[in-house]
Amino acid sequence: MMTGRELTDLLSKSYRRSHLTGTVENGVIAALDMEGRLFTVVNNKVINRVVPSAIINRSNKNAYQNPGGDTLWPAPEGTSLGYEYTTGTWRVPPSITGAVWEVVEEAPDRSVIRAETDLVNNLQTGIPCEFERIIEIKAIDNGLIQKVTEIIRYVGTRKLQKGTFLLAPWSLCQFDSGTLGKVTMPPPGKEDIWDYYEPSESQRQLQNNLYVVQTK
């Protein structure tokens, strides 16, 4: 695993702006020039997936660079109201890869970052937005509690009619995980869980009042 300092050094050498909430040993590094991605550091180890080559290189029409971390995406991706197929094939819109994220509020344990991002859906409807991430942390024994509030705010002046657009924030958080990897969380309601690909019932169960999901 990469250390927090190694990641901030890599971002700096790659001419990427970053912002730290907390400390470089226990905190959250926001990569402001990489779609506002977040990288969480616990006990001086970056727990998110990090792809150095995608930090050094830039996304363009021919190749999308996925640096890892935790990023805010607009939903839906597909359908006539989605945002990732406006040219016929999947792509991350340049308005997202080129968004200029800024720190608009900061404190030792809380930061707010924001970017203007104009979205275009498959109906070719333009939707001017602000993307915002509110990052809050609390240090605990041998760990870190992190809370991120995701916001996509419509800032246009025209009233959008029902059926002409859909818009919701979702976060894609990436980790490198082996065969023993698992995620634990408070039990969600049955209506809040569904499978995007293959059935996953065999990989998730309740243990000691916690929902445990095997990652492989």
Regions from the PLM with identified roles:
Residues M1-K147, I151, V155-K216:
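Surface-exposed acidic/polar loop and edge beta-strand patches at domain peripheries
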